Amino acid sequence: MPLSSIHTLPLEKLRNNLSSEGYKAFHASQVFNWVYKLRQSNWDQMTNLSLDLRSYLKENLLATQLVKKREVFLEDQETVKFLWQLSDNMLVESVLIYSEGRRTVCVSSQVGCPARCAFCASGKNGLKRNLTAAEIFEQVYQIDLWLLERKEKVSH
């Protein structure tokens, strides 16, 4: 069975999951603090969690399910395209658009497209599947991490 993403779990459900495995409920808040406030997606870097808990998290939850395959600045230097590989090896793109005072992310919500427009590559092979909410969210999350390295953040 594929692992679930941390981004699919509400805090209360993570508390219940951890408690049922013998961990303290407050550990869920620590995990959420690492993931959503400190923007850490590597379980090993969550140093205030025990090694045992980090091992449990690695075995049972994905901290990230998108793998960045490519990032390309377009000629206008105001647009960056990201190519992501999903856990089923399908590929999707996201676009970061720089504009005056804004950092806007355009996300994919599907693999492929049913429209098959002649001018668009997305529909050439038809619609493969809809993305999960976690896969859609993680596109924004990952691009925000990319921007944070540059002392910026997503605004739209």
Give, region by region, the residue ranges found by the protein language model.
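Flexible, acidic/Gly-rich N-terminal and inter-domain linker regions that tether
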Residues: 1-103
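Conserved Radical SAM active-site core
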Residues: 90-94, 100-108, 112-156
